[in-house]
């Protein structure tokens, strides 16, 4: 009985460690990604300031003709925030996933401990044949041990899958949102919404051939 209680306590401790370590690792990776994302946002925001190509405005200050800071000054550059499920939801779903493996492993081990017979020294050495009843119990006990190991492996696999795919989906969603925002910003620049020629001229550019005659009278 003491051996069974020791095994149950050890299994519970191992389960808590298995459930806690991946979460700590994922939390550290998420904090690192968020910090790198903030740094990348700052680099993108001020990337056009140092790309001087020789153009000057009316006051003689250098102006970048390729990159404008309209979206930066107006605060229109999108900030990508990765969504996460609440901590209680993640914990509850992990407990549900580990319930069957833990119960199965404990039950299988208790069955194996109950069924496996104790062999005599002569039977262990092979000098005496093992009776058929003991052979059947030994086979059932070994099968129960194999089932306990299988349930333990299932619990480890579910714990691993609970954390790893979520991280990859978060990174993919951030990359997709960032790519869409950059495409929209570039499209707006190409279509003339942030034309540097228009900004230096102080008004919209009038295409050739569309100039209207001005009445001077």
UniProtKB/Swiss-Prot annotation:
The keyword DNA-binding does not apply. It comes from the Eukaryota. Residues 171-217 are annotated as: Disordered. Residues 208-217 have a biased composition (Acidic residues). Keywords: Glycoprotein, Secreted, Signal. It is found in: Secreted. InterPro entries: Dense_granule_Gra7_protein. Residues 171-183 have a biased composition (Polar residues). Glycans are attached at residue 191. GO terms for cellular component: extracellular region. Residues 1-19 form the signal peptide. Belongs to the Gra7 family. This is Dense granule protein 1.
């Amino acid at each position: 009985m003491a051996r069974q209680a020791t095994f149950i306590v050890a299994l519970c401790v191992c389960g808590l460690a298995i459930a806690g370590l991946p979460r700590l690792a994922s939390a550290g990776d998420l904090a690192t990604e968020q910090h790198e994302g903030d740094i990348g946002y700052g680099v993108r925001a001020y990337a056009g300031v140092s790309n001087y190509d020789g153009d000057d405005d009316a006051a003689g200050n250098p102006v970048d003709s390729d990159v404008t800071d309209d979206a930066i000054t107006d605060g229109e550059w999108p900030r990508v925030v990765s969504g996460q499920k609440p901590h209680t939801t993640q914990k509850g779903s992990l407990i549900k996933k580990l319930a069957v493996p833990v119960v199965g492993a404990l039950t299988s081990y208790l069955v194996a401990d109950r069924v496996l017979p104790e062999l005599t020294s002569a039977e262990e050495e092979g000098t005496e044949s093992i009776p058929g009843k003991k052979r059947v119990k030994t086979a059932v006990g070994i099968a129960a041990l194999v089932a306990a190991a299988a349930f333990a492996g299932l619990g480890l696999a579910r714990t691993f899958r609970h954390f790893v795919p979520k991280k990859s989906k978060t990174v993919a969603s951030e990359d997709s949102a960032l790519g869409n925002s950059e495409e929209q910003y570039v499209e707006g620049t190409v279509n003339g919404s942030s034309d540097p020629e228009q900004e230096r001229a102080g008004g919209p550019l009038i295409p050739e051939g569309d100039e209207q005659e001005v009445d001077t009278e």
